[in-house]
Amino acid sequence: MKAQSSVLPVVVGILVVIIAVAVGVYVYNQYVMLSSPSASSSTGTSTGPSKISIPYSSSNKTVFLTIVVESSSNVNQFNFNGTSSGSLVIYIPAGSTVIVKFINQESLPHNLVLLQNSTPTPQSPEISSDGKIIDIVGATTSNYDVNGISGGASAEGVWGPISAGDYMLVCGILGHAASGMWAVLVASNNVTAPYAVID
């Protein structure tokens, strides 16, 4: 009986390591897909930005989205996946559920808000003046304007199903969106598989 009980913790430990490595690889691959400007469609002459595929389960209309606040001397500290001021545009099929992983590599706290915008760009330090808050990752409805996840932390959320329309992804902390920390999300009946473009 002693031999069996000493094997069980080893097996459990190995399984935990395998799962941790698999999750790490999955998150890294999503990050690379959305942060690199590499194309899924490039054939010599280009008429616009390249499409970057986003992981998707068509059987249950679920989009798997990773948004990273990058910490680099090459990017604005108010960024999503190294982009700012709406240059990241994400297209998803209308009616999709989005499982979002939000990672903050920057030293300042940040959060991620899905905003059904009433303005084309963030106009006010307080984001609720720019539209209707649909959901929040990394804060709550009572503290999104001052709280977020700290550097090195991550948070996850589930949004949707998201109706057809134009939305913004913004950091809700006062002034962050107006400083460029926003991207565009378009939910459309004409989109069959999610993708992103970086202008």
Curated annotation (Swiss-Prot):
Keywords from the UniProt entry: Cell membrane, Copper, Electron transport, Membrane, Metal-binding, Respiratory chain, Signal-anchor, Transmembrane, Transmembrane helix, Transport
Keyword Magnesium: no
Keyword Transport: yes
Membrane topology: Single-pass type II membrane protein
Entries under InterPro entries matching the protein: Cu_oxidase_CS, Cupredoxin, SoxE, SoxE-like_C, SoxE_N
Subcellular location: Cell membrane
Top-level taxon of origin: Archaea
Transmembrane annotation, as ranges: 7-27
Record-annotated Plastocyanin-like domain positions: 79-188
Broad class of the protein's primary localization: membrane
GO cellular component: plasma membrane
Binding site for Cu cation: 110, 171, 176, 181
GO molecular function, one term: copper ion binding
Xref: Pfam families: SoxE, SoxE_N
SUPFAM superfamilies: Cupredoxins
Reported function: The 4 redox proteins SoxE, SoxF, SoxG and SoxH probably form part of a membrane respiratory complex together with SoxM, a catalytic subunit of cytochrome oxidase.
Family stated for the protein in its record: Belongs to the multicopper oxidase family.
Protein name (database record): Sulfocyanin
Organismal lineage: Archaea, Thermoproteota, Thermoprotei, Sulfolobales, Sulfolobaceae
